[in-house]
């Protein structure tokens, strides 16, 4: 989860988030090199006393500064497209969970079980226990098995919402009348926090998401206790 004064991304807990962090570093390095080159050229232009008044065109230079940016854009686009298609792939999910956005809470339905659904509301500040996080804790966490592909079906009952868990690389819009899907996979057990990431009304900031990833055996015991 995020912590105060954090500058970087949250620790990756899914293969998709690991790919996104690698792509971020890859792109940032290209931007840094281009910015350094531009600043260097600007400093040369400001400090040099040499001028050339007879040059009207330079075909070689124009060719270079046309081809080189195209190559750089390709180097950025190829890994970006690869990750984009990876995020859309859902191969043999072991579980499907439907989440619906409401003003201002989330509801979850485990479609592989006959009667396993619940609403998830934020716990008010005056009801928090010691050690719990303000505006991030909920009364009912969504529990899922770790290290397994899980399909999330995401929609909304009223206005636009967005279901987002940054450390898992997830952010999917919840749109009324439309069913979006995403893949959830976690490399390790833990509790992961997110929030609605689309302004949806006066209590938009009171729509936290808490996702608890546990081993498969514990998940089976949890599901049996609720059905």
Curated annotation (Swiss-Prot):
Cofactor needs: Cu cation
Sequence positions that bind Mg(2+): 198
Binding annotation for Cu cation A2: 196, 198, 200, 204
Keyword match Mitochondrion: yes
EC number: 7.1.1.9
Single GO MF annotation: cytochrome-c oxidase activity
Reaction it catalyzes: 4 Fe(II)-[cytochrome c] + O2 + 8 H(+)(in) = 4 Fe(III)-[cytochrome c] + 2 H2O + 4 H(+)(out)
Cofactor stoichiometry and binding remark: Binds a dinuclear copper A center per subunit.
Residues in the Mitochondrial matrix compartment per record: 46-59
Localization in the cell: Mitochondrion inner membrane
Subunit-structure text: Component of the cytochrome c oxidase (complex IV, CIV), a multisubunit enzyme composed of 14 subunits. The complex is composed of a catalytic core of 3 subunits MT-CO1, MT-CO2 and MT-CO3, encoded in the mitochondrial DNA, and 11 supernumerary subunits COX4I, COX5A, COX5B, COX6A, COX6B, COX6C, COX7A, COX7B, COX7C, COX8 and NDUFA4, which are encoded in the nuclear genome.
Known function: Component of the cytochrome c oxidase, the last enzyme in the mitochondrial electron transport chain which drives oxidative phosphorylation. The respiratory chain contains 3 multisubunit complexes succinate dehydrogenase (complex II, CII), ubiquinol-cytochrome c oxidoreductase (cytochrome b-c1 complex, complex III, CIII) and cytochrome c oxidase (complex IV, CIV), that cooperate to transfer electrons derived from NADH and succinate to molecular oxygen, creating an electrochemical gradient over the inner membrane that drives transmembrane transport and the ATP synthase.
Family: Belongs to the cytochrome c oxidase subunit 2 family.
Name of this chain's protein: Cytochrome c oxidase subunit 2
Species annotation: Taterillus emini
Gene transcribed to yield this protein: MT-CO2
């Amino acid at each position: 989860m995020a912590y105060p004064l954090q500058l970087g991304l949250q620790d990756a807990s899914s293969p998709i988030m690991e790919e996104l962090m690698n792509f971020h570093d890859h792109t940032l390095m290209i931007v840094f090199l281009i910015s350094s080159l531009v600043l260097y050229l600007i400093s040369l232009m400001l400090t040099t006393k040499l001028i050339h008044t007879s040059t009207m065109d330079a075909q070689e230079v124009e060719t270079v500064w046309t081809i080189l940016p195209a190559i750089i854009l390709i180097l950025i686009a190829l890994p970006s497209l690869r990750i984009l298609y990876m995020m859309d792939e859902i191969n043999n999910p072991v579980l499907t969970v439907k989440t619906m956005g409401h003003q201002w809470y989330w509801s979850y339905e485990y479609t592989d079980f006959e009667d396993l659904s619940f609403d998830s509301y934020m716990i008010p500040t005056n009801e928090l226990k010691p050690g719990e996080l303000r505006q991030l804790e909920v009364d009912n966490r969504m529990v899922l098995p770790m290290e397994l592909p899980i399909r999330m079906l995401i929609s909304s009952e009223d206005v636009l919402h967005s279901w987002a868990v940054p450390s898992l690389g997830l952010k999917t819009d919840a749109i009324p009348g439309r069913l979006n899907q995403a893949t959830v996979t976690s490399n390790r057990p833990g509790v992961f926090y997110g929030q609605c990431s689309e302004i949806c009304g006066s209590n938009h900031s009171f729509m936290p998401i808490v996702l608890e990833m546990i081993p498969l055996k514990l998940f089976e015991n949890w599901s049996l206790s609720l059905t």
